[in-house]
Amino acid sequence: MKIFFIFSYDLRKYFRKYSYICDEINTILFEKRRAMNDSNTINKGSLPGLKEKRYLQKKAIIGFLYRMGELSKPEICRLTNVTTPTVSRMIEELIEEGWVIDRGCGNSIGGKRPHVFSLNPDAAYILGVDIGREYLRVAIFNLKNEPIEGILEYPSILEEQDDEATLRYVREKIDETIGHLNIDRAKIKMAGFALPGLIDREGTSYTYLTYEQPGIKSILEEMLQIPVFIDNDSNVMAMAEHTFGVAKDVNNVLCISVNECIGLGMILNSKLYRGGIGMAGEFGHIRISGLEAPCHCGKIGCLETVSSGRAIEKVAGKPLQDIIEAARKDDISAIDLLHRAGEKLGEGIATMVHLFNPDMVVIGGEIVQAGDLMLVPVQQAINKYALARMRGHCELKMSNLGVYSAILGTLMMVMEHLYDDTECGYSLY
């Protein structure tokens, strides 16, 4: 087990290149869902009328405190359209229940310093799980959007065992993580899972953990006894990059993940594009000229046969990390191997530039460790194959979230569902 320590009291010491990460999540979520109608996002029909009303009022207060950090009572009244006496009573009850902390006097912007309140970051948690072909990463996020102590990494058995054994293993490692962190399981309210391969809008996986009825989403919810959300790893990577990565606030972004396989998450007009049944972005299986090798999908000449981590490792006969280290030490064969992979990847990206006219292309996944050894040949190929006016509008960047973009994206996936007022039944409270 590897533990990547990201201390809850100071996430920014670890993520130095994007130190604004936690504040940005809260700010963006608030801007996106500030005026949500809480009465439409929870089903508590079994509660008596007055109790249901109080429940919804508390839920609204928790929601705004989660997204905005610290608020005074007048600000809470304005945001929730609830009277001061009611807000005062709700705040007192939430403090007694352990959800809210009285922070005392906050900063003044003129006049008397306001009395402010915030969420107790340990009142509830969100589970994030990134199931890769070569790794399993697990994190538990608090209400400050910080992974508690760190992101834990375990070996993956996704391609070695059947679905039942894999699920047992995932459950075992989740339990191990919870035990290692010594937290109350009952405080984990929701979970987000990232998986490689084909996943439809309903959360059914068609490549790994292929339970068609009732589907892997329902099976995980039964296993964990909490709401679970599932998406393709490239899609959640795109969500993370667009929210607090190098593609923050960029309207049209193609996020390409290069791990053992190749995937694509597309942000078009600032929204994740999923396609008709949710399976858009199988970039690794486009046909590239001059390639004749058979792909594991059964086709011939796919991009994955030359530019994926699996293809690079197959040629070199060693792990990707060792190949990258050799290239850094001026090993000509390793440099040539990465250059060819990057060149063909850039040829494929040039086609995507012509089709989608993006503002930015972000390369992420395990390949980010190669840096310019991969980025330079990719850019050269784009310059060679893409129309000048279109490539001139498009920036090419490596992810600054590194190998953690997918697991950070699982948090964003949960938050998107939590504060989407077209969905019902999801609440931290």
Regions found by a protein language model. Name each.
Residues 67-68, 244, 259:
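Short helix-capping/turn signature of helix-turn-helix
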Residues 150-252, 373-385:
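Glycine-rich phosphate-binding loop and adjoining helix at the ATP-binding site
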Residues 4-186, 291-294, 299-429:
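ATP-binding/phosphotransfer module of carbohydrate and carboxylate kinases, centering on a glycine-rich
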Residues 102-103, 228-232, 266:
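General beta-strand structural signal in soluble alpha/beta enzymes
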